[in-house]
Design a protein with these regions (language model features):
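Short juxta-domain linker segments that transition from a proline/glycine-rich
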Residues: 1-291
């Protein structure tokens, strides 16, 4: 049984939007926990990583935290193909729901009756894949970092997200340790590799000292001129990642006879007829998270 939802401080400024999000989250997480119990899947419960929360007293500490977390989770230095899937395997529930345009995502905790908390990252279903992945990593930062009051928590989480998605040594290997110029084509090739925006890549290169402020300003001047900093944003968008674990557990329980068709449809938030059609079809189109 869930008792409520705790959003991180100042995460949502609108009380109405917070109440709507909380109601949606409670409904979905209740069903999520129910299907986990039915199929006996306790392995996806959240266990805080070793050494966390990582103390951040300066922004470079956020970089080190990302490196240590990748090591703890045995990620190596390779890009993460599907961050949504990876986080769900670690016990973080990922939901995609509609939000206002000024909000990409937020992290909260759903409280169980026994006092334990389920971490939930909510992503605005309207955003593109590169913004989604960066937002997921940013909100993961809020979950695992302990940021000193003397520095900006949002900037620290941004630095963490950049380092988590674009490990230092890999980016240096691809781009070089010092550049006096970089082409737009290069940036878009790197975008395909890491699944992040060219703007995030440019900031990351600046943070690592690959190039300085003048090149960064020149790049952002070009981004502005091309209209890439406003909708529909830059070319070659990354496809959004959809949370799939909940659906898989429901179809698994149905196949194993652990739930009836009507119960599976209820959990998925669809009609029995729709369920019967989906069971026989490949998962070839994006399906929204049930509301």
């Amino acid at each position: 049984c869930l008792e409520g939802v705790e959003f991180r401080k100042k995460a949502i400024t609108s009380h109405k939007e917070e109440a709507t999000a909380a109601a949606t989250i409670l409904g979905v997480i209740e069903r999520y926990l129910e299907i986990e119990e039915i199929v006996g899947a306790p392995s996806a419960s959240w266990t805080p990583p070793a050494e966390s929360p990582f103390v951040v007293r300066e922004y470079s500490d956020a970089e080190h935290a990302a490196t240590r977390l990748r090591g703890t989770w045995n990620l190596g230095n390779e890009p993460i193909p599907n961050l949504t899937e990876f986080l769900e395997e670690r016990g973080v529930k990922v939901l995609r729901i509609p939000f206002s345009d000024n909000m990409d995502g937020v992290m909260c905790k759903a409280r169980k009756g026994n006092g334990t908390a389920v971490p939930v990252i909510i992503i605005n279903e309207k955003i593109n894949g590169e913004r989604q992945r960066f937002t997921l990593a940013h909100e993961l930062g809020h979950l695992v970092l302990d940021v000193d009051k003397c520095i900006d928590e949002e900037k620290a989480s941004h630095r963490f997200a950049s380092a988590f998605l674009m490990p230092r040594e890999v980016l240096l290997s691809e781009v070089g340790r010092h550049r006096t110029s970089i082409s737009i084509r290069e940036l878009f090739q790197i975008k395909k590799m890491f699944g992040v925006s060219v703007q995030a890549i440019a900031y990351r290169c600046k943070d690592l000292g690959i190039f300085g402020d003048s090149i960064l300003r020149g790049l952002f001047k070009h981004f502005n001129e091309q209209g890439w900093r406003r909708p529909p944003y830059e070319p070659m968008p990354i496809d959004p990642e959809s949370p799939r674990r909940f659906d898989r557990l429901c179809y698994r329980a149905l196949s194993e006879g652990q739930v009836s068709e009507s119960k599976a449809a209820e959990l998925l938030g669809i009609s029995v007829r729709n369920l019967s059609e989906r069971v026989l079809q490949p998962e070839d189109r994006e399906e929204p998270t049930p509301a």
